[in-house]
């Protein structure tokens, strides 16, 4: 309860920011989304609001059992405000996670009428799934396409994976390879640059292989699947919520959510039958928090390094210092490739008279995002300048009559 109370306090602060963005008092952190809270997009914000609602439901139930109706009334008022912002966040992943977590909330009771309520909620989820899909169909199709490409990454290195934090470095090349093999894929014209798997389980499998995903799932099950005498109800519900949310988002790439997962996994009742906690729990929690923060800091440092490399590359490229720009663009293309980076790298190679590598970069950029004209134009211009007229004509006709 103490953990829940402190968590609610933090979420309430974020909720106030959300209402400020809703009324255009506070500026959003994303040009395409009006409500993002303290985050850069609505996904993590919706996750935190869902956590708040789940905690409120837990507290409200206990107030109802204890017949503390005044406290229950206050919780319902606060829950109404939180629920309104939760819906406004438009985070479908958080909606699904909350619905399933609340269903399990009722399944935890012994009385059949409560379990029937949980079953009804699960049935509601099944019937509402098509509506949630159609609500933002293009976004849903995009995630399905990303997951399809992720399976290609997993198949390429099923046992070892690509290594820690390798997803961003490998994904766009895998997407380019997939769309080159399947040029008529229904999502080819809509494909964009991307660095997220939108599924923590797939990301872990891509980076650490089958052993990594087995360990990851085992850790989740260890935290969730335990008897009521060994773990408290709220902790289990929050873990279920985060486990479901991780199916559609990037939970462990948002520091507050990653820390919350670690803390919830570490907290066990003193009567736990597991005996590997040989020293005080607070020390274990501190160690886990430090490990999470260090790992996240390393990721942030890597992201900062990528931005610095890309910024330097862009400056040198704009100044037409192609020899030096090439060095930085090669690093950027290795760490976090995009079609823009490959186009600039291709142009740098071209100006340095390395036509083979220039064509290779332009082709990859075209395959990464087949629905964009600019990569096609650069390849067309390359063919025209190098006097490869037939290829230039063929590509030019494709650009003129293509569906862009």
Report the location of each language-model feature.
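Short coil turns that delineate tetratricopeptide repeat
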Residues: 336-337, 370, 404
């Amino acid at each position: 309860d103490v953990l829940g109370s402190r968590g609610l306090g933090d979420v309430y602060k974020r909720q106030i920011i959300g209402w400020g963005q809703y009324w255009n008092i506070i500026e959003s952190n994303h040009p395409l989304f009006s409500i993002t809270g303290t985050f850069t997009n609505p996904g993590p914000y919706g996750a935190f609001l869902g956590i708040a609602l789940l905690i409120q439901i837990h507290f409200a139930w206990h107030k109802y059992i204890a017949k503390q109706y005044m406290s229950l009334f206050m919780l319902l008022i606060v829950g109404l405000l939180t629920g309104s912002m939760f819906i406004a966040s438009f985070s479908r992943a958080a909606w699904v996670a909350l619905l399933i977590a609340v269903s399990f909330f009722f399944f935890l009771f012994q009385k059949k009428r409560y379990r029937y309520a949980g079953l009804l909620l699960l049935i509601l989820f099944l019937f509402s799934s098509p509506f949630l899909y159609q609500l933002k169909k293009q976004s849903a199709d995009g995630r399905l396409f990303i997951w399809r490409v992720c399976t290609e990454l997993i198949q390429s290195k099923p046992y070892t994976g690509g290594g820690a934090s390798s997803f961003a470095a490998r994904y766009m090349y895998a997407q380019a390879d997939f769309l080159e093999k399947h040029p008529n894929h229904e999502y080819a014209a809509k494909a964009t640059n991307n660095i997220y798997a939108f599924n923590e389980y797939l990301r872990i499998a891509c980076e650490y292989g089958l052993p990594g995903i087995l360990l990851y799932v085992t850790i989740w099950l260890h935290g969730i699947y335990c008897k009521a005498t060994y773990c408290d109800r709220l902790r289990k519900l929050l873990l279920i919520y985060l486990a479901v949310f991780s199916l559609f988002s990037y939970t462990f790439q948002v520091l507050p959510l990653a820390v919350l997962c670690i803390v919830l996994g570490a907290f066990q009742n003193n009567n736990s039958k597991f005996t590997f906690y040989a020293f005080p729990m607070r020390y274990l929690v501190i160690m886990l928090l430090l490990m999470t923060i260090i790992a996240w800091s390393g990721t942030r440092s890597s992201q900062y390094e990528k931005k610095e490399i890309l910024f330097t590359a862009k400056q040198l490229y704009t100044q037409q210092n192609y020899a030096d720009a090439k060095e930085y663009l090669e690093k950027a293309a290795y760490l976090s490739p995009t079609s823009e980076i490959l186009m600039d790298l291709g142009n740098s190679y071209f100006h340095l008279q390395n036509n083979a590598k220039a064509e290779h970069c332009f082709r990859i950029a075209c395959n990464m995002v087949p629905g964009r004209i600019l990569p096609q134009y650069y390849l067309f211009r390359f063919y025209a300048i190098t006097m490869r007229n037939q290829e230039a004509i063929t590509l030019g006709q494709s650009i003129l009559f293509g569906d862009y």
